[in-house]
Structures are given as structure tokens and as C-alpha cells.
Amino acid sequence: LDREDGSLIHTASMAGILTSQGNLTYATTKHAVVGLAEWLSISYHDKGIRTSLLAPLGVNTPMLGGTDSKFAKNAAGTIKEPEDVANMVVDAIQEERFLILTDEIAQTWMERKTNDLERWLNGMRRLQGKMDSMP
């Protein structure tokens, strides 16, 4: 901060933007990361500190393999390799872009949520019901 120059990268998840089913702690802490990144961007961008938010759907890491979510791998979209995600982050830093999405469908889902929140919530409730009824 004293140098008034630099980049901060916050790794959240689409779970922090769209809310995921299954793991309360995961979803709420990812929401907190989104809020922190937005606040820092608003508060420090004009002071030379650039903030980016990485919100992947699925990255090929041990965490993805060890998940207990019934739909996690399916909902993760196209699983990205860590090296590809790292390249996306570097591009975003160079472009001074805030939001880093790893999958094109994520932008569509964000738009659907913001365009009609009630419809989005109803759809997510239906999905939760399907998950709850799975063996």
C-alpha cells in the first residue's frame, strides 16, 4: 500500500458469486472473499492497487477429487488445468481486469442470477431438491 502500486489476486469460486449447494462453510467463506475483493477494488484502485477476483468453476486439483458434493464434478463445467488458470490470472493482471472467470458459461449464469433473482433462487431450490433425493 505504501508503494501505491501492485496487484492483489483473491481466489474465490463461482460458489461465492452464485452460491453453491452442499457445503455451507465453503459457500459463505467464498462469498466473503468476493465481498473483500470488491471492497478492496473500490477502496484502493485509484491509489494504484489493482484487485482481481478469480472465480473458477473447476480446477484439476486434489480438492476437486475429494469433494463430498453429489454434483460437484458435473457442476464444475469443463475442468481446467492449474497452468491454464494461472495463465488466465496473468492475462487479467496485465489487462487490469477485476473478474477472472474460467468458463464462458459462468458469465451466462451470473447474468441469469442478476436479471431475475427470484427465478434463479427457485431454480437452485429445485436443484437442491434433486440433490436431496439422490441416494
Task: Label every model-predicted segment.
Residues 20-24:
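Active-site loop immediately N-terminal to the catalytic Tyr-X3-Lys motif
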Residues 16-18:
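Conserved catalytic-site region of short-chain dehydrogenase/reductase
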Residues 26, 34:
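Catalytic tyrosine of NAD(P)H-dependent dehydrogenase/reductases that use a Tyr as the general acid/base
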Residues 29:
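Active-site helix of classical SDR
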Residues 42-105:
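SDR active-site lid
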Residues 1-4, 45:
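Helix-to-beta-strand junctions that scaffold the AdoMet/dcAdoMet cofactor pocket
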Residues 13:
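Residue(s) in the substrate-gating loop at a strand-loop-helix junction
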